């Protein structure tokens, strides 16, 4: 029986048409946010409506400017100056900028742009301006793509601005795979779905005929691992994002497989296998089918996650009597415990920057999302609620998304995000209950 409903491919071709401008954007200048763990005063910026260069592009020009502004202000590092406060109007992309008018409303950064549309093709041009230096940063850039991909182009513009001002990579042009949930708590229907990082453009990847859990993107974002109960027992499946073609992995009679995650090579998968009441961590070569056992313990070992260089794996285990976090070599070997605080630790995931491990912690009746150094030091709890669990990293390693669920029969799961300092906690706007988020890498 085919469990999966076919959808159109998600891919979108985008072109960077002025690559010569990229080095200019990389230059150092006075317009800068230094990201630290202390209190940051958001940088005031303005994004006036982009100029419509062709008839019929007016609404699109406004919509793109709004998405760009929402991306930046949503980080907590930027504060948008509303259009009602603007003194100047930008009526032409190449017209001189009245910098004094923007200084008068305390804007430090300004993004101007234009949009043209011809048939299904859309082109957006933009410039980032340092208002107090009275100059644009670089010669201007443009992206082109299909009209249906206009939000991606807006996210890419925001990524460029974020990167230039903070000196770090952005994360707006990315997707999140998650589990959509409907129905009462004791009989929920669960489907795989994907969305833009901000909750827009939801697409469903499976039907609700079986329970699905723990989806994970490949390092290139073109495949998704997940666990399904379509056979009555948990099994790992691999889906091609473009075609939705799906196949099972690591099948073996009398076993259950779950908690899969890709290695950075995109070929190897680490997962948990339960057999005869014992759960250990294995790896599987998805091309050859070769399987290797990494742990051999009477305890429960699960939730493996690779370091960015692929040399180590962090996982959870109750080998010490309680649920704790351990790190071992990627090829197996003696693990070392890294969690040392009171409470139970689970769902570890290594930051793409390599410096932190995020986790779920249960302590004194509360659940927390936290981070620690890879040696277990500097543990910080970022959230606290009735149930917070399952963190996933944004591509730049600065933001986490996770599941939060309220108490009682009416409590519904929802997706939230928080930055690694514990600030800027916010709910992802979705029309359905959702759980198990997993962030993609930046889209190509």
From Swiss-Prot:
Pfam families: PD40, TolB_N. Residues 287-310 have a biased composition (Polar residues). Residues 1-26 form the signal peptide. Residues 287-311 are annotated as: Disordered. Keywords: Cell cycle, Cell division, Periplasm, Signal. SUPFAM superfamilies: TolB, N-terminal domain, Tricorn protease N-terminal domain. It is found in: Periplasm. The keyword Signal applies. It comes from the Bacteria. The keyword Cell division applies. InterPro entries: 6-blade_b-propeller_TolB-like, PD40, Tol-Pal_TolB, TolB_N. GO terms for cellular component: periplasmic space. GO terms for biological process: cell division; protein import. HAMAP family: TolB (MF_00671). Belongs to the TolB family. The Tol-Pal system is composed of five core proteins: the inner membrane proteins TolA, TolQ and TolR, the periplasmic protein TolB and the outer membrane protein Pal. They form a network linking the inner and outer membranes and the peptidoglycan layer. Part of the Tol-Pal system, which plays a role in outer membrane invagination during cell division and is important for maintaining outer membrane integrity. NCBIfam families: propeller_TolB. PANTHER family: PROTEIN TOLB, PROTEIN TOLB HOMOLOG. This is Tol-Pal system protein TolB. The gene is tolB.
């Amino acid at each position: 029986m085919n469990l999966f409903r076919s959808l159109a491919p998600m891919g979108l071709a985008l072109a960077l048409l002025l690559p010569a401008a990229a080095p200019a954007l990389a230059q150092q200048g006075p317009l800068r946010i230094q990201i630290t763990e202390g209190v940051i005063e958001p940088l005031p910026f303005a994004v006036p409506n982009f100029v419509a260069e062709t008839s019929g592009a007016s609404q699109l020009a406004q919509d793109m400017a709004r998405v760009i502004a929402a991306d930046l202000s949503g980080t907590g590092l930027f504060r948008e100056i509303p259009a009602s406060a603007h003194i100047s109007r930008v009526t032409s992309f190449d017209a001189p900028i009245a910098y004094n008018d923007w200084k008068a409303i305390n804007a430090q950064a300004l993004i101007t742009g234009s949009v043209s549309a011809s048939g299904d093709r859309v082109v957006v041009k933009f410039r980032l301006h340092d208002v107090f230096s009275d100059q644009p940063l670089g010669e201007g850039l443009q992206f082109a793509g299909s009209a249906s991909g206009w939000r991606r182009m807006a996210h890419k513009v925001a990524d460029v601005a974020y990167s230039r001002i903070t000196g770090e990579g952005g994360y707006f042009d990315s997707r999140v795979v998650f589990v959509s949930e409907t129905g009462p708590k004791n009989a929920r229907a669960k489907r795989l779905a994907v969305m833009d990082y901000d909750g827009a453009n939801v697409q469903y990847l499976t039907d609700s005929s079986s329970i699905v859990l723990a989806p994970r993107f490949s390092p290139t974002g073109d495949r998704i691992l997940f666990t399904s109960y379509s056979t009555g027992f948990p099994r790992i499946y691999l889906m091609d994002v473009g075609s939705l073609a799906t196949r099972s992995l690591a099948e073996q009679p009398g076993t259950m497989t779950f908690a899969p995650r890709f290695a950075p090579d995109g070929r190897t998968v680490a997962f948990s296998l339960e057999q005869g009441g014992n759960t250990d961590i294995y790896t599987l070569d998805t091309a050859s089918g070769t399987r290797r056992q990494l742990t051999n313990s009477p305890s429960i070992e699960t939730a493996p996650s690779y370091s960015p260089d692929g040399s180590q794996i962090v996982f959870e285990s109750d080998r010490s009597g309680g649920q704790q976090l351990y790190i071992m070599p990627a090829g197996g070997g003696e693990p070392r415990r890294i969690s040392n605080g009171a409470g139970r630790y689970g769902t570890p995931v290594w930051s793409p920057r390599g410096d932190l491990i995020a986790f779920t912690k249960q302590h004194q009746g509360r659940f927390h999302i936290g981070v620690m150094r890879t040696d277990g030091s500097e543990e910080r709890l970022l959230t606290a609620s009735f149930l917070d669990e399952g963190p996933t990293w944004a591509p730049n390693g600065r933001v986490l998304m996770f599941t939060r669920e309220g108490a009682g029969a009416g409590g519904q799961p929802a997706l939230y995000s928080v930055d690694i300092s514990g600030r800027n906690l916010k709910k992802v706007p979705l029309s359905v209950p959702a759980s198990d988020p997993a962030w993609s890498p930046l889209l190509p």
